[in-house]
Amino acid sequence: MIKKIKIIIDYQIKSFKYLFGGCNCIKSINFKKFYRNNINDMSLMFYECITLKELNLSNFNTDNVINMNSMFSGCSSLKELNLNNFNTNNVKDMSLCFLFVHH
């Protein structure tokens, strides 16, 4: 059972759609060394990650992201979320982004 993920390699991808969606055993994901500026879709990225408790996305470059639909929807255990440096100027869809995030 996966409980923790540490991202240390930066791949050349543009979409993170449903990347961790449905991973209901993960408690934390470390993006400490992650920086990418060509991502355009983060929809459903953490959808239904019901055991995820902390998430630091302060290193994310979101300048080109246009879709954050349901990004954190269903993350009902999320207690700590760092979105410092998040740029949402180009985002066209943030609907349901924080649906069922209670904390």
Regions found by a protein language model. Give the residues of each.
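Core hydrophobic positions of leucine-rich repeats
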Residues: 15-23, 40-49, 66-75, 92-101
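Structural signature of tandem-repeat unit edges
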Residues: 3-11, 25-38, 50-66, 77-90, ...
